[in-house]
A protein has these predicted regions:
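Two-component system phosphorelay core
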Residues: 1-120
Length: 120
């Protein structure tokens, strides 16, 4: 079995394990810790975003999305980061026609990633 096949990221869709560890200068333990912290801190992000939008607080929703975009990109969660970017752009540009579907897609991917991270 190759090293790639034994890396947890090779079995977690949406997690580029190799890139994430490389960003941390090879510190796999730190990467695992950051992924666990991400799962604990952002599991309810979609709910917070929806709550802000329901309250008419588009700035808070945008800020949440912007932060989530940066965190997911820095953790090498590219598919999720792309969906967060789409949601962020929809909110930023008041694209109310598409923002719910973007947030729904982001929420599904976020839930899947967090569920898979719980297997680490």
């Amino acid at each position: 079995m190759s090293d790639r096949e034994t890396q947890p990221g090779s079995i977690i869709p949406g997690v580029d394990w190799e890139s994430g560890v490389k960003r941390l200068m090879g510190n796999e333990q730190l990467y695992r810790k950051l992924l666990a912290k991400f799962a604990a801190s952002y599991g309810d992000a979609a709910g917070r975003i929806r709550d802000a939008l329901s309250a008419g607080d588009r700035q808070t929703a945008h800020n949440e999305l912007h932060t989530l975009k940066g965190v997911t990109a820095n953790l090498s969660l590219a598919p999720l980061a792309d969906l967060v970017l789409a949601a962020e752009q929809a909110v930023k540009h008041d694209d109310t026609e598409h923002e719910n579907e973007c947030i729904d897609a982001m929420s599904r991917e976020l839930d899947a990633v967090i569920k898979d991270l719980s297997k680490l």
